[in-house]
Amino acid sequence: MDFADPAQRAAFFAVHNDMPREGPGDRASVVEALRLAGPLPARPDILDLACGPGGQTLDLADLLPDARITALDGYAPFLRDLEARARKAGVLDRISIVHGDMARLPYAPQSFDLIWCEGAAYIIGFDTALAAWKSLLRPRGVLAPTEPVWLKPDPPASVRACWAAYPAMEDVASARRHAAAHGYDILGDFVLSDAAWQTHYYGPLETRLGAAAARLAGDPVAEAVLAEIRGEIECRRAYPEYYGYLFLVLRA
């Protein structure tokens, strides 16, 4: 879809607004990534990039009660959702919410102990993200991104079509090579579980998709956008063995 088209953008967010999270992931994956990261400083400074409505932000705040978290996203309604949820959870005083562009970050070098980015590094390019964000980490800081990867060679054309918007998508070994080439030590990695996709993302998304379809019936632009979202869900349901998100935990 074309986010520059106001009608398509409105239809997309008619489904995605008020979601608990904006991509595959869950608390269990946050716990595992933090385990791989190992001990952090006593009061770590964390940057959560493309935080969306903040499902993982709140998990980080809960699991790291002494952390100071900067949560950045380019879509203001998601940030309002995060603010409300953080206030309800009693952690708003430890989260700085920033409306900004992860491709143009305003932070000084060595500002953070941990940079987190679930499901969004590919938007600016995985290599670009690895290079740009490294300078923001303090010595022995950790970068924890998730990156879409092929899990099997030679995926069918129908599966590749699902990811046509990301032609640079590679396999697990390639993602590791890119990280090593940028001078990171790989502390560990793992592929997100099916529950991280279905239970915590596509399940809520399908519920909202049904409601939006009834509300937007008769609007051809909206119906095309909803069909694209539905196709994404169906692709994952049909071909989960061919692709996934790799959660990498990298030491600078």
Residue positions per predicted region:
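Class I SAM-dependent methyltransferase Rossmann-like catalytic core
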Residues: 10-27
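Conserved alpha-helix/loop element of class I SAM-dependent methyltransferases that forms part
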Residues: 23-42
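Class I SAM-dependent methyltransferase SAM/SAH-binding core
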Residues: 47, 55-104
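A short acidic, Gly/Pro-enriched loop at the edge of an enzyme's catalytic core
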Residues: 103-114
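A short SAM/SAH-binding and catalytic strip from SAM-dependent methyltransferases
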Residues: 114-127
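A short glycine-rich, Lys/Arg-flanked "PGG" loop and its adjoining helix->strand segment in the class I
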Residues: 128-142
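Short, glycine-/aromatic-enriched active-site segment of Class I SAM-dependent methyltransferases
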Residues: 148-166
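Conserved Class I S-adenosyl-L-methionine
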Residues: 190-252
